[in-house]
Design a protein with these regions (language model features):
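Catalytic cores of large soluble enzymes that bind and process phosphate-bearing ligands
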Residues: 15-18, 66, 112, 176, ...
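Accessory regions of macromolecular translocation/handling assemblies
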Residues: 37, 51-54, 60-70, 106, ...
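Conserved P-loop NTPase motor module
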Residues: 21, 138-202
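Glycine-rich loops and low-complexity Gly/Arg-rich segments
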Residues: 32-36, 77-80, 110-114, 131-136, ...
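Conserved ATP-driven motor cores of ASCE-family P-loop NTPases powering translocation/secretion/packaging/pilus
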Residues: 74-155
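P-loop NTPase motor domains
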Residues: 1-76, 142-148
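Active-site donor-binding loop signature of nucleotide-sugar glycosyltransferases
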Residues: 11, 111, 158
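Short, solvent-exposed amphipathic alpha-helical segments in soluble enzyme
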Residues: 24-27, 124-125, 160-161
């Protein structure tokens, strides 16, 4: 990450509790590294790339009725460390309001539930009268709101990722060599053990 390489964390095939713990521990380690560098070695922190953490099923981690996680802190206070949160969710109404307000750029796709549409339109500037428009969006269509620069809903098209990859077949992205699978597996086991310890303490 410190070299600007996009990293994907695949946590499929394990229990929901393990997925939750690993996701929180991984994000916490990376975000707090940026914070520590900012506090203790500012010149080296300036060399770090801006970090965007993309969180799938974000409502599971940002629900106000569940225990607070590192992702709330990232959205609310980590911007000054150049760490941002990209919260992906089909249930926006289950996102903590304070966090939702800090997500300035929103890409809104078709939303069936009236509860979620109401939450979006009531709590997103310049989207007050877009309930029907959100309901009528087709597959791959979205509305873009980006405060404070864009002060109206901009229609946009979302690429179908398999087609995107097909168009770039054979492109050499010159990625840095990956670590050995055995080394990554050992680190995953350590994170898993840390998650078990955290669960016992709670």
């Amino acid at each position: 990450i410190s070299k600007g390489v996009t990293c994907l964390v695949d946590i499929s095939g394990i229990s929901s509790e393990e997925q939750y713990n690993i996701t929180c521990l991984t994000a916490s380690s990376v975000a707090r590294y940026y914070k520590q560098m900012w506090e203790e070695n500012y010149s080296e922190w300036e060399k770090l790339p801006t970090l965007l953490i993309t969180l799938e099923e974000a409502h599971e981690f940002l629900d106000p009725n569940k225990p607070k996680t590192i992702f709330s802190d990232i959205a609310l206070t980590y911007r000054k460390y150049r760490v941002g949160l990209n919260a992906v969710t089909p249930r926006p109404s289950r996102i903590n309001f304070d966090v939702f307000a800090e997500l300035w750029t929103k890409i809104i796709m078709k939303t069936e539930l009236s509860q979620d549409r109401s939450y979006l339109t009531k709590n997103t500037p310049f989207l007050e009268y877009s309930d029907t428009e959100i309901k009528m969006l087709d597959v791959g269509e979205a509305l873009l709101i980006s405060e404070p620069r864009i002060k109206f809903a901009v229609p946009m098209k979302v690429l179908h990722y398999p087609e995107y990859l097909d168009e770039r077949e054979g492109v050499d992205y010159k990625l840095t060599p990956s670590k050995a699978l055995s080394e990554m597996d050992e680190r995953l086991k350590r994170i898993h053990r840390a998650g078990e310890s955290l669960s016992r303490e709670q």
